[in-house]
Structure formats: C-alpha cells, structure tokens
C-alpha cells in the first residue's frame, strides 16, 4: 500500500473552501456526465450522526469510468464492469472518502482530509505511527509554482493572471504563500487587507493487491491521477470564485438535490445528451472533483446557474482519476464513441440512432470492435461480469499466496465449462445488423495490386500510419530520436583520495515497451524503471545487504518499434471497418495476430535506424554515468536488460559489437566467411528494379521470409548513414544479457528458415538469460534454436522468492545438464526418435551413457551456446491468467517483470555470482560453495510476527567466535528488524548451519533453535561433533523468511599469535562509518596484509553497537581489508573501552591468545595496557597527548614509514606455532568486487576446459 500526504494551501478561509469545493463537485458532476461509460449516479445523499468526524453528510455515488481508463487497464476488464463506488463522509472540517470497485475486490483508495487555517506547517495531523509514518511521503502542492502544461493549461485559471471581479483578489505572486502567512498568522481571517490562508491536509492510501499490477497501478494513481487532478482542481477553486462566492450551505444543498435528479435522468437514458456542457471537448469526471475541489477539463465551461447539484460531501472525491490522463487528446467524435453515440451513421449522412439503441450496442461484446457483433446467447452484460470476476478472483488468490502469511485453500473451478462455452461462442463470426460505415478504409485491400495502388491509398503509406497513430491519441515516436534519461547532471570527478568506485555492477535497462505499445511515453518508462529500482533495493536489503550501494540501475529509453506493425495489422483486421480508432477505445487490438507484430516490426525500414538510436542512447547513458560521482573510476561489470521489444534492439546492438550483422550470413558466429555476402552491397533477395518506390519494396520484401525479418535496403534519403560499415556500436563490454518475455527466438527462427546452414549470430556477451511466463503469447524458448536436443528438456523453473529467497540450488551450468541428462546427448544411442524409456530401464542404462557422451558433442554444443549456463527460464504466473484474452496478457506480463521478486532475486544470484555469503577469498581458483536452504519458508509460530515484520528489513548480527581447542564451542546471535532494532524476533525457529571443509565444502545442519524474548539464541556444539583447528563459516537462517546472519568460528591452538586493530582508531580517517563513506588511512590495508602474510591471526575490535555490524563489515570489504575476526559491543554501551578490554582479556586468559601487536588511537592505549602489552607492542596513529606518549609507539610519520620498518631486516618475524597453518589468507568478499571480469572469464574458460579434459580422459 502506498501512502502519500498532500498539503495544499489556498488563499481562502476554511468556510469559503467548503463552499467552493461542494459547488464545483455539483457543477462538474452535471457537466461531465455523458451517459453510459462516463458519468456519475448519486445513490444516497443524506445527513448522518455519530459517524466519522461526528455529525455530517453521507453520500454514495457510482462513477462510470469506462471512457477514462488507459488501454492496458481496459484490456483486463469488461466494459460492463468499469464502475467505481464512492462513499463519502463530510463532517467539515474533517472529511473522508473511500473508493472501491465491486469488480476488483482488492482495490481501494482511501482519502482523509483535515482543513486548518495555516500554511501547512503541521507535521502529523493524522497522528500516524509506526510503518505508516515511516513510509508516508509528503507532497506540498503550490497552485502558483506547480504549473500545468500543454492542453491542461488554461490561462483564465492561472493564479498568476486571475483577478476576481467580486472579491478583487488576485493575481498571486511566486512568493504568495510566505506573504499571506506573514499577514494572517495569529489574526482572524479574512484580515482587513482581505487576505486569508488555509491548508487542506489530504492523506491518500492506495492499495491494488493483484499479481503483476500492484506497484504500477498504485504509482499510476498517485503520480499521474491524484496529483495532477488535485493541482488543477485547486487552481479552479481559486479561479472560479466569482461563481460560488456568496452562496450559502443551503444553496449548495439545493444544488445537490437538483443535480441528483438531473443525473438520474441522464444516466437512465431519459434525456438526450444535448446539453451544451456535454459537448465540451474534454472528458473528465466529477469523481476527481470530489477529492480535489474541482475536476479536469480542456477549456473553461460556462458557469452553471446556482441551481445546484449534488453534495459530494467528501472533500476527497473520486478515484476514477485512474485513467483520466488518457483523455487529453480526445476529440468530440471520440467522446461520442465513448458515450455510445454511433458515428457511423453520421459519416454516412444517415439519421442518428436513438440513445437506447446506442447504449445497447455499447454493452454488447467483449473484444473491442468485435463486441459490436450480435451474440445470440444470453446477456453479454451479466456474463462479462461473471467471467471477469472469475478471472480476477484467480489473480487475487495468487496475490494472497505471495503474502507473508500463506494459506493453502482449494479453488472451485466449476465455471470452466461456462468459460469454454463463452470462448467458442465469442469467436464465431456472426453478421452485423447495422449497415457498414461509409468512408472506411476498405479500399486498403487493393494494396495487394502493387502497381495499381496509389500512394495515399496504401496502408503501408507513412501518412496513413501516422494518421492511425494520431487518431489513437498517441504521439508517434518512431521517427523521434531516443531521449536519454539523465537523472543527474554531470558532476565533477570524485575525490582523488577515493579508494575505489562504489558501484561494482551497472545495469542498463533497454526499455521499448510491450508488443502492444504503439508509442509508450517517457514518463511510463521512467515509472517502470523506478518501480524496478525500488523492488531491487527491497530484495537486496532483505537478503543481499552486501550488494546495497554497489548496484546502479540506469534506463536506456528506446522509440517504439511496433507503431507501423500495429497500424498495418489493425487495418487488415476483419473488423477494421467497425469503428474509428480513438484514445478511449483502441480498436482491433483483440483481432490482431500478436505473434506477427514482432516479425513486421523488425521488417520496418526504420528498424535499423532505431537500433542506431538505441546504441547511441546506451553510449550516452554509459558515458554520463562515468562522469557522475557514483560512476567515477568504474571498472565493474555491465549487465544489459531488455524488455519485450527492447530485447530485440539490445540483441541487434550486441551483435554489432561482435562485428556481425544479425541479418547477414557474415554475422553468423563460427560459420564460414566465404559464403557471407554484405546485404547492402549485394543481396540475392533484393528487388530486381532498384527504382521501385518504398511501398513496392516493402511488398516485395513481404513475399520472402528472409526479407520479412531483415529490414529492406534503407531509403535513399538515409542510405549513407545506415551502411553496415558505419553502424553505431556499443562503447562498453556487456557481461550478462537478460531478456523479459522476448519474441527473439521467433524472429531468429524465421531467419533460419531462409538459410538453414548459417549459424545464428551470437551476441557479444558472456551469458544470455531468456526469462518468460509460460502463458505469454509472444514469448518463446531460445535453447531449441541452438540445439534440438533441448526441445525435450523443460526450461529451468525460477524458484519462487516467497519460498526460496536464496534459490533452491538447482543446477544451471550447461555441463551439469549434460551430466544429468546424458541420454539426450549421446550420439550412439538416439533417444530423440526412440520410444520413451521407463524410469527403471533408463536408470539401468544411464551409468553407461555418462561415459559415452563424446567430447566432440560437448565441444560443438559449447561453441554455439550463448554462455556457460542454461538460457531458458520459466517464471511462475497464476493459473487464472490462462483465462484472460490474449490481447490483455502482454500489458500484464510487461508490468509484472518490474516488481517481481522472483525475477529480481534470480538476477541478483546471477550477477552476484553467489547465492549466499561466500567464505573469505582464497588464493586458489576453487569456487566458493553456495548456500541453499534445504526447505521452503514455514509459517511463523506466532501469528503477530508476520504483521510486525511488514516493511522492515532484517538487521541480524553475530560476533565472530575465537575458542581454544578443547573448550566449549558456543555460538551466539541476535535477530532484530529495523535500523534501530525496533522489532525483536521472539519465539521463532532459527536453523544453524556450519561449513566443516571451507572454502568449498558442504553446509552441515547442526540444530534448530528458538529465539528468546530478546531475539537471541545461544547454541553450544556438542562434544561428539566438536570441530578441530580451523576457521569455519557459520550461517543461521530464520525459518519464517529465510533471512540470515553470517559469522565465523575460529578453533585455534594454544599460544596462537595475533595482531589487534581498532577499526575506528586505526583505519578511518574521518569520524563516522555510518554516514558518508569514510576515508581510509593511507597504508592501513598494506599493514594488515603484511601481518597476515606472516601468519598472524587478525582481530578487529570496535566499541560500536552490534546493530551497525553489516554496515561496518561492508565498509571493510569494500576497501579490501584482509579477513579477520570482528568483535562489536553488545548493544549501546556507555563504556566502549571497557568492552574492548574485557573481550581481549577473555581471549588472553581463557583461550591462550598471544597478542603480538596492537593498533589504535590514543583512547585505546589504556585498553592495550590493561591487557598487559608492552610499549613497543602498542602502535598509535593520530594525535597523542604528552602524558600518554611514553606508554605507546606513536606513528607520527604514518603507516607508510611504519610498514617500511616492518619490512626491514629485524622489523617483524613470522608467526610461530601451528596456528598459521589454519589461518586462510584473503579478504572479505563482496560479489562483483573481489575479481575483475577478465579474470573471472579466464577462470570460467579454465573450468570448462578442465571438465572437457575429464570427459576426454574418461572416454
């Protein structure tokens, strides 16, 4: 649920605001009710007692919002279900309004408002607490500074220009708020200077809990609908004061009564929509006016006489703002279509149909224009509702299953029969009673005659395609150059003293929209990426905290590539004649063959130019990132991520970087170059007559599969810039490439049909991941294109984040697949064409098949594979989606990727190269073992736990343990949530695991403990399984949510020599580790490494509270400090030095530790002296008082001079004893930071070669 508090000051008194708000609600309700599909019905309007806010007025309304929703929402809902109910309680100066949709049970919009005569300075008027207060976003709306743009701007409503004739108020200056507050503060309003000031405090809670749509719709309502409507409405409240000034509350009530009667007559079809206000060229609803004291319109409407309308007592008003921004470009005829007025009769010059007949036709049908066909079965209205409710119920159940508390209930699917019946009947092509409209685009069918069609009469003509796009109300973006999202200005380079770039992974999101996006706006792209970034951070904070601040996500916006394809296919639809396109009801999308859209899109003459723009935009984003503070000195890995259409552009760009062109044989990876020809210099499929015009060349290309998927020769006006030799290439190297619901394999399959011998172009990246939902109508598998053997193998199922947040450990490597399925890769035993073997017979033969997989088979598969892992990954989606119409799914799936924790957790596991926290870096090349929970998450033992832990991140911690062999080996940990330990995990199960053979051993389960009331557990390893010498990783996992804490236990022999470092005293050159990243003292890391190389055990101590453990360890890891054992204070301590002393004394006296040297600040001298250390063993950096200088060795020349002395002869000696044999040499590991990309690629190749060598030796 998103919570946002709006504070809207206005130069009115509280009582004037009340009159203005109620007047405009009534006025706009009357003006903007057009009948079916757009209007308001007032059901109840009566006083109440002892309700919200005390006594007031209760109103219940029904808003018909069908004409105001964007297409991606309307595609999910039937027309007959597009209503919103409002309940409003108006107990002025408190109001509350709640909006619900009977069809969407998990949707709600709740708005509370308080009105105070101030300037908005009160911080918490709603008395919020806990997570509500933490998650609240405050947004101050200034009616003067916050301007409207484009068609929303009306000069007469601009407070900078408006002057009231009745009151003489206005105009308002930029600093009006400060001026008015100085005038009215502490005075009675209005003042003698006729100045007043009040503020509406509105808190809005939006919830839309359905799979794949929650975040996008909640942000859509907040960012687009609510704020935009409130700004415009309050500007109107000020600019329309000449109409409402002087009215009393009795006048308002009479207006409401008359409006209720008028609306009942209009919405019931009892009068024609001939009122002047109805024909205004804008579409807006009074629902918005109710919550914003006004509503949207394109230009000023004539004042309504004070015969009033209804009272929408709630100052909050309507939530049908959900789609009102789509109406900006609507024309009068589009409004008429949306309200059921038949335009086909007007076009043909015939008489207008009756209103009742128009409403009846508007209620028919389900899929766009096809809905106008007559259906002989029952009532379409009731049945659409039944089907739609069935669908959304299935989505709701799946949404609930993702919550913290899981329920396992049965679903009653008895309605399947009715659904099957509905599907078959709806697809029958009945004739239409109405005469065909004249003047339609039927003549476009003559395009098949290439030489006879005139240019302006072709559906392939650019003028026609642009006209189709403009009639939808969308701006055509194909010709416009891609704009780059520069979220920050160029900043100067970082400080030269910065040791390393904070960003280790850069993710570039190539966003071109879904397959049905004719022209997506930049704001929508930014919203998707913002949602993705927020979801990414939430998952990292919960389970991958070491990656926080090290991953940067940038957007590469791309023009839409489907505009022409959608225009052509919708024109070819059998139902293209039925209605004209409009923004309110995009036609024929349900009738378009979705699978053909990407094929026509890549065949567009503009496709290669769009790829050039995409590459240029990606390069600009990359270079801007390098200039920014977060990217200065960046040398990490770059990950590219493409959505449905963006993946096609990204693939072409990556193939260019490889020196190949996907559309040519020369671009084939590992294929013979002698057969390659340049498509621009000579192409056997090019038209014989080079002088053919563009339309003829397009049709010629349409006759051949190869030319269908490779863009025709560029038009003459830009042929020089589109040659392969001048094609733009990426300026950086991509590590991993993720595709979301991509149709790439279909495009490549069609290319393969033309030349079966040519290999498919391989993108220039290390690994490709093809993520898709099985029910997605455009997504398809990629692996069978590279090897037919994989058509038998199922794609990898991405584990559910709700059950396996750290992954389930399933094998992903290509060689692991060959090993686990040898029967499919054996040349001698062709099981592809044979009978299916039983499990018993297959088990008996597999042992012989594993050794018989030939080295040539493995080598051939690796050569043509796009990485070292599997390529196809199937995502979970609710079963109810299979019952949605195909045209509704692309929008839904496209929105789901940006907020899916399954997708994000999978990406993190791949780019981080680990699925748990790895052991310390070692000098060998062995891979670190990954941790995978052995079982899915369980329900919490205490019911309140899931409620308490919502919206808070885990902050578990455990100090490292040093114990002498033979003594008790006890592990202690504390499990808390929130940055300041606000929530304690009480009475819940925690699993304790340990790795006995580090660094690449197996995790061993030790025990399950239950936390006490303080969130602590204490576990002692039994003597019979106690551990010998060594340093062992320990992981404690919370059973309920799989959050975990990591620590190390060191079992050491007596007289183990160590070196102690105080983190704050000896490492940091600034005061705080918790604020900005502090600088490291020069040479500190080198001194630590010197002692480690001599075999000493390193111990890091700090008096900081253990709640800061994750942040401090991450800081040490970022700066590559060698591994050591860390000790924090237990909670907030008033004596941090005493904690250090007690800790070191315990090690020396009880565990036989010998401290050779100790480093710190002047404050640490007393600590080391109390432990019994000599002056020549204590090294102090920084300023030291004269009284203490004799108690320690002061490093006045810094670490550099000290290190030189240590490295000199006699300066230091190697550690003695057996302890140095068990102490590893390495650093704290941070994913993506410990090894550079080139070395990682070398190790991967080395591993693959080793595996192949093993197979060869076995054979």
Swiss-Prot record:
GO function terms (MF aspect): metal ion binding; phosphatidic acid binding; phosphatidic acid transfer activity; phosphatidylcholine binding; phosphatidylcholine transporter activity; phosphatidylinositol binding; phosphatidylinositol transfer activity
Keyword annotations from UniProtKB, A to Z: Calcium, Calcium transport, Ion transport, Phosphoprotein, Sensory transduction, Transport, Vision
Polar residues composition-biased segments: 679-689
Tissue expression summary: Expressed in adult heads, not detected in bodies.
Variant or mutagenesis effect after changing residue 95 to C: Increased phosphatidic acid binding but no effect on phosphatidylinositol binding or transfer activity
Regions of compositional bias (Acidic residues) in chain numbering: 318-335
One cellular component (GO) term of this entry: cytoplasm
SUPFAM superfamilies per UniProt: Bet v1-like (SSF55961), HAD-like (SSF56784)
Domain spans labelled DDHD: 730-913
Modified residues (Phosphoserine): 274, 277, 401, 403, 434
Result of knocking out the encoding gene: Flies exhibit rapid light-induced retinal degeneration.
Disulfide bonds: none
InterPro entries per record: DDHD_dom (IPR004177), HAD-like_sf (IPR036412), LNS2/PITP (IPR031315), PI_transfer (IPR001666), PI_transfer_N (IPR055261), START-like_dom_sf (IPR023393)
Region span, Disordered: 268-378, 427-454, 472-500, 660-692
Function: Catalyzes the transfer of phosphatidylinositol (PI) and phosphatidic acid (PA) between membranes. May control phosphatidylinositol concentration in transport vesicles from the subrhabdomeric cisternae (SRC) to the rhabdomere. May function as a calcium transporter.
Family, per entry: Belongs to the PtdIns transfer protein family. PI transfer class IIA subfamily.
Name of protein: Protein retinal degeneration B
Gene of this entry: rdgB
